[in-house]
């Protein structure tokens, strides 16, 4: 079932309007490509019509909040005569997805709907009572990517807190984990390293849907919101995003493809170093490199490790923004050749340790402490600096990972 080489967006978009009357071969081919899975926004209005009638809705969303026909959640709610969309809330990158990572997004009036849009990234990460004064139900419809340091899940957590504090029900419109729901990897975040790229003690790769995470956050971390998860239909844990046949809309500017979501928990750690993680290229998180790296040397060394489900190709690139902007970088491109066997965190740690060992005079962990925040602790960086093997590092967190796995099972919906 799994593909050995990723299918790109064009393969995902081959579905359209299907007419029941047609029986032509072309129609059959189109039907075969029809999405298997219905997300929360698809099941919301049919399943919760009575509960929503006459309610004022606040919606936290971004461009990836679409139904199976690519219609925006904003438009779906705004056009429904039985409810009133009264407020929009934008996470990092904004409701329309037009801001780069780290850019603050201001509040404004949405041009299409006339609904006020409030930013939840920057100084204000939690909806205020003033923002919620005309809201009866607060909804969340954003595509997560299954990695702890992707900030949308903490936008959700803060919004759940605000809903609890203001006596407002909170609804999560569930969506697939693009990486599937069976694999968990990586160290558990230690509380002293909590930040907006890691708020709670969960593993780096959690293997949960956004709705399942909401349930876990709500109970395990005592948010206690009046939470409803609007479930998907037909999603199975073994499915990656391609298996759902849903259209993939990039959830953030540097997450352009399904392939990006798979490599992100590996090379996202590189953001905490002086190595480019490929921002400013057309292959963010797939391309990694720096001016001082020798591409062929790195390619050969990494491939000699025989890491499962991944192959490295020597590559050079010039980032148009972010680290090493306008400077020729040399490194590798990652190709995930088997999604089921690929171990993202092991791969990421192996890449960082290999570059550290090959270029000790040039490689650096950033002085901002960002690597420790991404890793969720300080000891992984120390172990890499001290020459500890990747296997030893992984063994150091396996016990706590297994403990989390037991807790996680209580909140699995599918």
UniProtKB/Swiss-Prot annotation:
This is Peptidoglycan beta-N-acetylmuramidase NamZ. The keyword Transferase does not apply. Contains an N-terminal catalytic domain and a C-terminal auxiliary domain. A putative active site is located in a cleft within the interface of two subdomains. Its main location: secreted. Belongs to the glycoside hydrolase 171 family. It is found in: Secreted. Residues 1-23 form the signal peptide. It is an enzyme of class 3 (hydrolase). Keywords: Cell wall biogenesis/degradation, Hydrolase, Secreted, Signal. The keyword Iron does not apply. Disruption phenotype: Deletion mutant accumulates specific cell wall fragments and shows growth defects under starvation conditions. Optimum temperature is 37 degrees Celsius. Stable from 4 to 37 degrees Celsius. Catalyzes the exo-lytic cleavage of beta-1,4-N-acetylmuramate (beta-1,4-MurNAc) from the non-reducing ends of peptidoglycan chains. Specifically hydrolyzes the natural, peptidoglycan-derived disaccharide MurNAc-GlcNAc and the artificial substrate para-nitrophenyl beta-N-acetylmuramic acid (pNP-MurNAc). Requires a MurNAc entity at the non-reducing end, and cannot cleave GlcNAc-MurNAc. Probably plays a role in cell wall turnover and recycling. One of its GO terms (molecular function) is peptidoglycan beta-N-acetylmuramidase activity. GO terms for cellular component: extracellular region. The lineage of its organism: Bacteria, Bacillati, Bacillota, Bacilli, Bacillales. Disulfide bonds: none annotated. It comes from Bacillus subtilis (strain 168). Homodimer in solution.
């Amino acid at each position: 079932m799994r593909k050995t080489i990723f299918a790109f967006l064009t393969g995902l978009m081959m579905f359209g309007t299907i007419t029941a009357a047609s029986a032509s071969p072309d129609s059959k081919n189109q039907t075969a490509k029809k999405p298997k899975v219905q997300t929360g926004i698809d099941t919301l209005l049919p399943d919760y019509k009575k509960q929503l009638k006459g309610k004022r809705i606040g919606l936290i969303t971004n461009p990836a909040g679409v139904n199976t026909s690519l219609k925006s959640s904003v438009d779906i709610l705004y056009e429904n005569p039985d409810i009133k969309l009264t407020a929009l809330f934008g996470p990092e990158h904004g409701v329309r997805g037009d801001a780069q990572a780290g850019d603050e997004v201001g509040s404004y009036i949405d041009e299409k709907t006339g609904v006020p849009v409030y930013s939840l990234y920057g100084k204000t990460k939690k909806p205020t009572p003033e923002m919620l004064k005309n809201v009866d139900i607060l909804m969340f419809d954003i595509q997560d990517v299954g990695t702890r340091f992707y900030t949308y899940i903490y936008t959700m957590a803060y919004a759940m807190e605000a809903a609890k504090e203001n006596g407002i029900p909170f609804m999560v419109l569930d969506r697939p984990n693009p990486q599937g729901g069976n694999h968990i990897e990586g160290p558990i975040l230690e509380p002293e390293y909590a930040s907006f790229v890691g708020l709670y003690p969960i593993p780096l790769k959690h293997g949960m849907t956004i709705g399942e995470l909401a349930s876990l956050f709500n109970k395990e971390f005592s948010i206690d919101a009046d939470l409803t998860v609007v479930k998907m239909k037909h999603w199975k844990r073994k499915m990656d995003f391609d298996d759902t046949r849903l259209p993939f809309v990039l959830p953030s500017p540097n997450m352009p493809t399904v392939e990006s979501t798979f490599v992100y928990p590996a090379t996202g750690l590189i953001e905490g170093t002086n190595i480019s993680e490929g921002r400013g290229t057309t292959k963010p998180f797939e391309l990694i490199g720096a001016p001082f790296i020798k591409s062929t040397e790195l390619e050969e060394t990494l491939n000699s490790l025989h890491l499962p489900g991944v192959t490295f190709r020597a590559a050079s690139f010039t980032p148009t923004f972010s680290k090493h902007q306008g400077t020729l970088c040399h490194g590798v491109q990652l190709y995930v050749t088997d999604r089921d066997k690929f171990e993202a965190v092991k791969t990421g740690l192996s890449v960082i340790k290999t570059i550290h060992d090959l270029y000790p005079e040039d490689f650096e962990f950033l002085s901002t402490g960002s690597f420790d925040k991404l890793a969720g602790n300080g000891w992984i960086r120390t172990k890499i600096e001290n020459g500890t093997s990747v296997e030893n590092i992984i063994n150091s967190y396996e016990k706590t990972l297994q403990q989390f796995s037991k807790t996680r099972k209580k909140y699995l919906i599918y």
